[in-house]
Amino acid sequence: MGARCSKFSFCLFPSHFKSASVLESPDIENGGKVWPTFKEFKLEQLKSATGGFSSDNIVSEHGEKAPNVVYRGRLDDGRLIAVKRFNRLAWADHRQFLDEAKAVGSLRSDRLANLIGCCFEGEERLLVAEFMPHETLAKHLFHWENNPMKWAMRLRVALCLAQALEYCSNKGRALYHDLNAYRVLFDKDGNPRLSCFGLMKNSRDGKSYSTNLAFTPPEYLRTGRVTPESVVFSFGTVLLDLMSGKHIPPSHALDLIRGKNCAMLMDSALEGHFSNEDGTELVRLATRCLQYEARERPNVKSLVTSLVTLQKESDVASYVLMGIPHETEAEEESPLSLTPFGDACLRVDLTAIQEILSKIGYKDDEGIANELSFQMWTNQMQESLNSKKQGDLAFRSKDFTTAVDCYTQFIDGGTMVSPTVHARRCLSYLMNDNAQEALTDALQAQVVSPDWPTALYLQAACLFKLGMEADAQQALKDGTTLEAKKSNKR
């Protein structure tokens, strides 16, 4: 759940929802925080949100080769989402899938990347969760670029993970499938969250562990069943990751511990940054979790109690410990190098946007509109073209109400697809103070033409109008990145 992009979607809510707004529910356990209610998404919504399940939006390990792929996306209200798409052999019975998803979707905690919805249409089975923008624990431990994760942050990760498991256990969801460093994510504030995806199997009768068998609980190898004690064993392997900065097989780690070679187990990058007492206690906890006999392992409640006493620098924000930019810091970054169109969208200069769109015409539609038009020249197609021409005349003469009507007739005709028409109707909606409809068109322009920076810049203008400045800035940044990629290919 990681790489940056700006993929939004259209929320076409089914009739049984009260309105197109996000339904929310308070959570007393989390300080009365308001959470989005679990919902069923349409497949078309999730296609739009992920750019048609574009490979550019894959954020899961092993990319497209994984049996179940996770995509980054964005809903039309600006929220980032993670979408897990199961392979077509998983969850043949959609009712079982829905029941399981609803059960997991009822959980709400600051320690989880919460499940906010699902989708089942035909053979498709998808889960939708909150998106965590700052990568996985595996990335920060095993593939760090600038600085290793600090000791205090590693202890915080261990505690938050234990608290997440305790919360799930208290809610009747004690089983977690394939717990590992890739399941621990970091939110916008750098706080660790446990992915909700592991609370469901990869299929109704599928495997609960996909990692190397060397990291699998011994009882699972014997019985094929996951128990709460199996989860504690896997938690112990994550403790090893945190201590060593490497993915060490439990058997090897235990050999080092029994041989009193604990120093060889610890990450050399942490030398001098923790006390012997703290290191010894964490090794002790890991050893207890990794006991061969399941009954000899601690429960998650006792793990939380032990880890609370080890915490350091508790008053320091996670994003500071992680060394990652925060929202307030992001505002101070160097300004983007914008094209004239991008700059006009930054300033929400609608007149300038209209002039540039009029000037570039339909050159960006090359290879799109005709390629998607399979019908012969019929009366219906001629009517659509006439509607587009009338819309263009109204657009140039700044009669934006007429432009919206004519472009709508062209789009509804369905005989041709044009990102430029969506861009022009987007601007026409903005001129008529209808930013939400404008954003929908900007999103659709990107769905039709995923590599078109203009769509991203227009999304930024719409988001600025809607008061969503942080998301608008991100859309500008993504548009600039896409513009640079296109320039490099020329």
Swiss-Prot record:
The active site is at 178 (proton acceptor). Its main location: membrane. It is a lipid-anchor. It is found in: Cell membrane. GO terms for cellular component: plasma membrane. Phosphorylated by BRI1, ASK7/BIN2 and ASK9/BIL2. Gene3D superfamilies: Phosphorylase Kinase, domain 1 (3.30.200.20), Tetratricopeptide repeat domain (1.25.40.10), Transferase(Phosphotransferase) domain 1 (1.10.510.10). The keyword Transmembrane helix does not apply. Keywords: ATP-binding, Brassinosteroid signaling pathway, Cell membrane, Kinase, Lipoprotein, Membrane, Myristate, Nucleotide-binding, Phosphoprotein, Serine/threonine-protein kinase, Transferase. Probable serine/threonine kinase that acts as a positive regulator of brassinosteroid (BR) signaling downstream of the receptor kinase BRI1. Functions redundantly with BSK3, BSK4, BSK7 and BSK8. This is Serine/threonine-protein kinase BSK6. It comes from Arabidopsis thaliana (Mouse-ear cress). The gene is BSK6.
